[in-house]
A protein has these predicted regions:
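Solvent-exposed, polar/charged alpha-helical surfaces in well-ordered, non-transmembrane soluble domains
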Residues: 20-23, 39, 43, 95-99, ...
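Mature extracytoplasmic/periplasmic domains
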Residues: 76, 80, 85-143
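A ligand-binding cleft/hinge motif common to bilobed small-molecule-binding domains
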Residues: 42, 48-65
């Protein structure tokens, strides 16, 4: 929703333009109210998906002619949060796992899966990046915007309050 909002004149703080965009899709008969997957795309049920580029990258392996479009004016990023529970049975093992995830090897595994590693710039500079996997990523232009947790919460609240009347 945040991507649709930013692409249509909204912002990380104002997702109303995103809800309006989906309302316009509904009015035009182009909104399909199902969760799209590679299977629904193959079947022709959902010819367009709004999803993270790393998920779309995986569809290209299964769907002939699959294309990924990242709007230049609305590149939105997000991080996965990692945590170690101090009361875990083996917190040292959990810390080692975290170290592995953020090691060059772990980051290159994220990259091979189509995700953009958080340490990508540093790994490119040091020559530790898997250059073939990096080259396979969808091209983006512009600087990604990263919504804060507060912005995501407010966006979710707005969508919860306004979605059904927009697409019903």
């Amino acid at each position: 929703m945040i991507l649709a909002a930013v692409a249509n004149g909204g912002s990380l703080d104002d997702v109303s333009k995103g809800v309006d965009f989906f309302h316009q899709l509904k009015q035009a008969g182009n909104y399909v109210p199902i969760i799209g997957t590679a299977a629904t795309v193959k079947a022709g049920t959902t010819p367009v998906l709004f999803e993270w580029d790393y998920l779309s990258t995986s569809h290209g392996k299964d769907i002939s002619g699959w294309k990924i479009f990242v709007p230049a004016n609305a590149t939105i990023g997000g991080y996965y949060a990692q945590a170690v529970n101090k009361d875990a049975p083996h917190p040292a093992s959990a810390r080692l796992w975290e170290e592995y995830l953020y090691s060059d090897e772990g980051q290159n595994l994220w990259l091979k899966g189509g995700a953009r590693p958080v340490r990508q710039a540093a790994m490119e500079k040091s020559g530790k990046i898997d250059s073939a996997a990096a080259a396979a990523l969808p091209k983006i232009t512009g600087t990604p915007q990263f919504p804060t947790q507060d912005q995501q919460t407010k966006a979710g609240d707005y969508v919860a309050a306004n979605w059904s009347k927009a697409v019903s």
